[in-house]
Swiss-Prot record:
This is ATP-dependent DNA helicase RecQ. ATP binds at Y23, R27, Q30, G50, G51, G52, K53, S54. GO terms for molecular function: 3'-5' DNA helicase activity; ATP binding; ATP hydrolysis activity; ATP-dependent activity, acting on DNA; catalytic activity, acting on a nucleic acid; DNA binding; DNA helicase activity; four-way junction helicase activity. It holds the Pfam family DEAD. It comes from Escherichia coli (strain K12).
Length: 609
């Protein structure tokens, strides 16, 4: 393309931005990407949700003379984009299975005659032989592959139909390709470039940081009640609640509705018209909350979602990041709340182990472990996210639960040096479990076979628990001093940032591992204050006695959450007891008296213990 022509197109980009899309200035990175595409060079764009990825191909589509084809995985995503473009006066259309044959022919005629500038299409439809023949005659000027991480088995949402897109480079060797994603680590990025056959692409990686989103975690205790209270505290704000099964989606939505909250279920098992109705009502603010499986949201461009809840832990950080990214797209404060129970992680791990052995299972295991490390982090959660994506930062954000309510710190320089030195001494070839065994001086054949029992660092940390050293190494990963090489069975490897700590040139504050105190502290925090642990123990003992007499499990009497609240509020009258979550009239009548008597005796200090 001639230089003068490129310059003319580049100046036109600002005009299209202002006149067609109504924005006065480009966001960081957008202009360079657009200029690169207009010059005919391939691009890989990694930009957070709400960061303006779509404009990177929509503006060139309006400046280049011809058809731009956009590969998109979901009908809802296509429809949303096309509706927005048409509202801006752009000749855009999509081809999908919900259209009649007449509608599809009309779209194809528009592509052939040049009336349509942007065509959205699913990968499986695009790759049909007869469609590729049509496309060749239409002389496309740009191919944009949205959600490009779907092409990579290293990605968090691999889709086999995306893998076939690699054949397009042979069919269209000179056509500029653009791949776009919000979530791709370095391995996934390399995979996208290789599998799509991108030629010397510009790789534009924007910051993954969404500073307006507050990342929070609540340990599950009585999850539905915790969720109800959380939603009620939102006071009518718009939100999405993600669950990992259709049944839980239905149950949770019904529970919210029973509390008078405007909520609806959304999952792939519902009829198309029901899903479309829910999506439309949510988009129009006629519905406060959508309770959904992960099928919901990829096509959502609702700017005023104020909170996203993960009622179950996702299988990987990429999914978590993408789904939480649907909050606060207007840049105003928003919150991402993760409900966490280590048992959920154990269940996901069991499910994973039932899958066929192989590289794909290894990838999924690595990603699941990273998600678990995020949930159990004792350092700034935003740092965990950003360092996972390779965006090295060491300054805590001040806007997550860890920063707002920090765990106790200690001078971890010596522990860090032991861990970092051990990683280096075993040649950065081994995973966390093995490194911890060396640190603690484990006496096993594998360590002896490698001669690692002869290392100076062997056994230097035997005075501390396995959990302690796992916590230390996880924190070093979160702080960007250590990485896990997914391609080498999650081997621990040192970064440049580790050098000054290893040399003793800088000290390092680490969080005291909350191995024992974590659960009680999380529960105490969830229920809004301190509770009397001695009284709690007595209440549990009484509950066990009553449950045994009644031949029911203890939780049928009162669950632990209710007992903690009793130990916090110390109710000694019927009205006070009824104010405790989990105590209704029937349970008050049946079990109330002995519990109130025990609490009264404890308060008066004249109980037996």
């Amino acid at each position: 393309m001639a230089q003068a022509e490129v310059l003319n197109l580049e100046s036109g980009a600002k005009q299209v931005l202002q006149e067609t899309f109504g924005y006065q200035q480009f966001r960081p990175g957008q202009e360079e990407i657009i200029d690169t595409v207009l010059s005919g060079r391939d691009c890989l764009v990694v930009m957070p949700t709400g960061g303006g990825k779509s404009l990177c191909y929509q503006i060139p589509a309006l400046l280049l003379n011809g058809l731009t084809v956009v590969v998109s995985p979901l009908i809802s995503l296509m429809k949303d984009q096309v509706d927005q473009l048409q509202a801006n006066g752009v000749a855009a259309a999509c081809l999908n299975s919900t259209q009649t044959r007449e509608q599809q022919l009309e779209v194809m005629t528009g592509c052939r005659t040049g009336q349509i500038r942007l065509l959205y299409i699913a990968p499986e439809r695009l790759m049909l032989d007869n469609f590729l023949e049509h496309l060749a005659h239409w002389n496309p000027v740009l191919l944009a592959v949205d959600e490009a991480h779907c092409i990579s088995q290293w990605g968090h949402d691999f889709r086999p139909e995306y893998a076939a897109l690699g054949q397009l480079r042979q069919r269209f060797p000179t056509l500029p390709f653009m791949a776009l994603t919000a979530t791709a680590d370095d391995t996934t990025r390399q995979d996208i470039v290789r599998l799509l056959g991108l030629n010397d692409p510009l790789i534009q990686i924007s910051s993954f940081d969404r500073p307006n989103i507050r990342y929070m975690l609540m340990e599950k205790f009585k999850p539905l009640d915790q969720l109800m209270r959380y939603v009620q505290e939102q006071r009518g704000k718009s939100g999405i609640i993600y669950c990992n099964s259709r049944a839980k989606v239905e149950d949770t939505a019904a529970r919210l509705q029973s509390k008078g909250i405007s909520a609806a279920a959304y999952h792939a098992g519902l009829e198309n018209n029901v899903r479309a109705d829910v999506q439309e009502k949510f988009q129009r603010d006629d519905l406060q909350i959508v309770v959904a499986t992960v099928a919901f949201g990829m096509g959502i461009n609702k700017p005023n979602v104020r909170f996203v809840v993960h009622f179950d832990i996702p299988r990987n950080i990429e999914s978590y990041y993408q789904e939480t990214g649907r909050a606060g797209r207007d840049g105003l404060p928003a919150e991402a709340m993760l409900f966490y129970d280590p048992a959920d992680m154990a269940w996901l791990r069991r499910c994973l182990e039932e899958k066929p052995q192989g590289q794909l299972q290894d990838i999924e295991r690595h990603k699941l472990n990273a998600m678990g490390a995020f949930a159990e982090a004792q350092t700034c959660r935003r740092l965990v996210l950003l360092n996972y994506f390779g965006e090295g930062r060491q300054e805590p954000c001040g806007n997550c639960d860890i920063c707002l309510d920090p765990p106790k710190q200690y001078d971890g320089s010596t522990d860090a040096q032991i861990a970092l030195s051990t990683i280096g001494r075993v040649n950065q070839r081994f995973g966390m479990g093995y490194v911890v065994e060396v640190i603690r001086g484990a006496n096993n054949q594998r360590i002896r076979d490698y001669g690692h029992d002869k290392l100076k660092v062997y056994g230097m940390g035997r005075d501390k628990s396995h959990e302690h050293w796992v916590s230390v190494i996880r924190q070093l990963i979160h702080l960007g001093l250590v990485t896990q090489n997914i391609a080498q069975h999650s081997a621990l490897q040192l970064t440049e940032a580790a050098r000054p700590v290893l040399r003793g040139e800088s000290s390092l504050q680490l969080a005291v591992p909350r191995i024992v105190a974590l659960k009680p502290k999380a529960m105490q925090k969830s229920f809004g204050g301190n509770y009397d642990r001695k009284l709690f123990a007595k209440l549990r003992k009484l509950r066990k006695s009553i449950a045994d007499e009644s031949n029911v499990p203890p939780y049928v009497v009162f669950n632990d959450a209710t007992l903690i609240e009793m130990a916090e509020q110390m109710p000694i009258t019927a009205s006070e007891m009824l104010s405790v979550n989990g105590v209704g009239m029937r349970k008050l009548e049946r079990f109330g008296k002995p519990f109130m008597a025990l609490i009264r005796a404890h308060v008066d200090g004249d109980d037996e213990e």
